[in-house]
Design a protein with these regions (language model features):
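Glycine/proline-rich active-site loop of Rossmann-fold NAD(P)-dependent oxidoreductases
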Residues: 27, 42-45, 52-65, 72-74, ...
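Catalytic helix-loop patch of NAD(P)-dependent Rossmann-fold dehydrogenases
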Residues: 3-46, 53, 57-59
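Catalytic Tyr-x(3-8)-Lys segment
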Residues: 17, 83-84, 163-167
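Short aromatic/basic micro-patch
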Residues: 46, 88, 119, 153, ...
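PAPS/PAP-binding and catalytic site of the sulfotransferase fold
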Residues: 62, 121-133, 174-178
Length: 187
């Protein structure tokens, strides 16, 4: 959603001003899908995922990386003051949304947000990881990264209406499940 300051982020909000290469490619992909849907009648549902996490998460992403570094007694990089907020969405909820989107046939083209529709401050995420790992985090403060946004927050009204999407896993439970997997996979 780029420089959009209105929250939660709705699918109808403008995305024409991305502030990272990743966001630019996502917007371009949606335009390409819209074009193919219009020209060739391809039924297309573009899903906008909000900070997906859970078992088997890529090791370079924040939750997995933080869990590993905390477990190793190493500092975790925190960009800015820790007040950035993310709409963390558990992988099982994303899977439920994807499955519903596969079966959706209400129109030829849709863009739909999939998130938990709740924001969590980075400091709170770190506290949850410390609690579940039963270890303190060492913080390595760093400047904000270019292209990072202060918050992500999904409006999932459309997903609820069109897909029956209803995320079930709140961050507290999701982190507990992630840490259980992390411990078993690291053993």
């Amino acid at each position: 959603y780029g420089i959009n300051s209105r929250v939660p982020f709705s699918e109808d909000d403008p995305v024409a001003q991305p502030i990272s290469p990743y966001a630019a490619t996502k917007a371009a992909g949606e335009l390409l899908c819209h074009t193919y849907s219009h020209l060739f009648g391809f039924r297309t549902v573009c899903l906008r995922f909000f900070t997906v996490y859970g078992p088997r998460q890529r090791p370079d992403l924040a939750i997995h990386k933080f869990a590993r570094l905390i477990s190793e007694g190493k500092p975790i990089p925190v960009f800015g003051d820790g007040t950035t907020r993310r709409d963390y969405t558990y992988v099982d909820d994303i899977i439920a949304g994807v499955r519903a989107a596969i079966d959706y046939d209400g129109s030829d083209y849709e863009v739909i947000n999939l998130g938990e529709s709740r924001t969590v401050e980075l400091r709170e995420l770190i506290t949850l990881l410390e609690k579940e790992l039963d270890l303190p985090a060492q913080i390595d403060r760093q400047p904000l990264q270019p292209g990072d946004v202060p918050q992500t927050f999904a409006d999932i009204t459309k997903a609820r209406r069109l897909l029956g999407y209803d995320p079930q896993t709140q961050i507290e439970s999701g982190i507990k499940q992630f840490v259980a997997w992390f411990r078993n996979s690291s053993a």
